[in-house]
Amino acid sequence: MPILTTSSLDGSVLEIVLDRPKANTIDATTSRELSQIFDSFNRDTTHRVAIFTAAGEKFFSAGWDLNASNEGEAFDSDYGVGGFGGFPELPNRNKPIIAAVNGMAVGGGFEIAMAADFIVAADHAQFFLPETRVGVLPDAGTIRLPRLLPRQLANEIIFGGRRLSAAEAESWGIVNRVVPIAELMTS
């Protein structure tokens, strides 16, 4: 079973699905593959928008694969041209990317969602950065979140690990739209 699948929807929409049971985590190999997919998308003339989502309904992504770290993979390894998750650092990005958040967006998964141009979330989705609970700062979370939220709320999420429901994330402008899971890919 492939970890990443792509398909063309309506001819101009590229759907990218992450499928790494149990929590759709991302290791360096997966990140490099995502970078290649998003770099190709950026250059192709067929697709005008990409939708990035994940398999299942529990996790959009739990971010970095901690098991890969336990097996010796360096946390700061080569993620590919687009950075961790394939597109947050992609140079000359010229087409919109939609994160279709189908479950929990945790740590790096939340950071990847924030790097998208639009976020559509299932009504049961949650967003949080638990890294500081184990003494690690959430890399991009410390940069992106304070740009989206009042500083005090951003600090509470970054340093306190506060969880946001999809509805609360929408009320603060992090999420563009909250929909039932059945409507996530069609809204």
Name these PLM-found stretches.
Residues 23-24, 59, 135, 177:
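Short strand->helix junction
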Residues 32-39, 43, 66-102, 137, ...:
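An acidic, glycine-rich surface segment that forms the CoA-thioester-binding/catalytic face
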Residues 25, 59-62, 68-69, 107:
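Short active-site-adjacent helix-start/loop capping segments
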Residues 16, 52, 65, 112-114, ...:
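Hydrophobic/aromatic residues within transmembrane alpha-helices
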Residues 91-187:
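Crotonase-fold acyl-CoA enzyme core
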Residues 28-29, 64, 111, 140:
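Generic recognition of short, well-ordered alpha-helical segments
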Residues 1-57:
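Conserved CoA-thioester-binding segment of acyl-CoA-metabolizing enzymes
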